[in-house]
């Protein structure tokens, strides 16, 4: 980041102009890592050093992949399968190691374990019915990871939040295109990458446990 500004946004070798994308992504990633560290501090304070280290390893890996997918889908409108499947496996491991040994047969835990698949199926149905016009299958694969990372209750709310954010941004872009001729190509048929909205919703759900539908109250009955 420092060299980016020190060299005047130019490559040291070819002197070509560099995009603002690079320092912004690096700064955002660094801030994200600090936030993740802060969320895991209670483990460290309580003396659970091994649990802290394992959580940090898994979470930093998960969110590093999320950052890559955010930027990649934003620019290329595609989610690489290799990253999606790797993310899903790591998220599933994260979910499994946080299940109490005496709670495997409880409904909340069973829903959390099944969350990835349960979230993937509606995306797959939309993709299949629309022949890929409404939503990409890559978004469904990303839903696998979201379900296993956040669990059923928070994951479901995070997905709903992602759709709300996506709808709000879509409407805003349509209004901008209607008011400014430079953005006239932004129409109802314009393709907008959805993974960034899914990832933003996931981040909010990770930091602030969400339950839009009061499902946790049902579990308390």
Regions found by a protein language model. Give the residues of each.
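Functional transmembrane core segments of multi-pass inner-membrane proteins
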Residues: 46-51, 56-165, 170, 213-221
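C-terminal transmembrane module of polytopic alpha-helical membrane proteins
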Residues: 187, 203-221
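Juxtamembrane "helix-exit" motif on the non-cytosolic side of transmembrane helices
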Residues: 39-43, 97-102, 178-180
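Membrane-proximal soluble regions of multi-pass membrane proteins
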Residues: 1-21, 186-188, 194
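Interfacial loop-to-transmembrane junctions
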Residues: 172-204
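Membrane-interface loop-to-helix entry segments
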Residues: 24, 78-83, 191-196
């Amino acid at each position: 980041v420092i060299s980016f500004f020190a060299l005047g946004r130019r490559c040291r070798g070819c002197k070509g102009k560099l995009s603002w994308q690079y320092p912004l992504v690096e700064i955002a990633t660094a801030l994200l890592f600090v936030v993740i560290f802060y969320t895991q501090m209670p483990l460290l304070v309580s003396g659970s050093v091994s649990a802290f280290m394992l959580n940090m390893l898994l979470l930093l890996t998960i969110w590093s992949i999320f950052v890559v997918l955010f930027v990649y889908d934003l620019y290329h409108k595609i989610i690489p399968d290799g990253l999606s499947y790797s993310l899903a496996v790591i998220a599933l491991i994260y979910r499994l190691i946080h299940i109490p040994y005496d709670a495997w047969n409880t409904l909340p835990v069973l829903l959390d374990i099944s969350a990835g698949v349960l979230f993937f199926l509606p995306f797959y149905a939309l993709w299949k019915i629309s022949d890929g016009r409404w939503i990409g299958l890559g978004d469904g694969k990303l839903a696998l990871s979201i379900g296993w990372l956040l669990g059923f209750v928070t994951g479901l709310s995070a997905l709903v939040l992602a759709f709300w954010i996506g709808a709000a941004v879509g409407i805003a872009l349509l209004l901008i295109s209607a008011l400014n001729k430079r953005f006239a190509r932004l129409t109802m048929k314009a393709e907008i990458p959805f993974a960034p909205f899914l990832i933003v919703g996931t981040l909010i759900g990770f930091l602030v446990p969400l339950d839009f539908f009061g499902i946790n109250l049902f579990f308390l009955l």
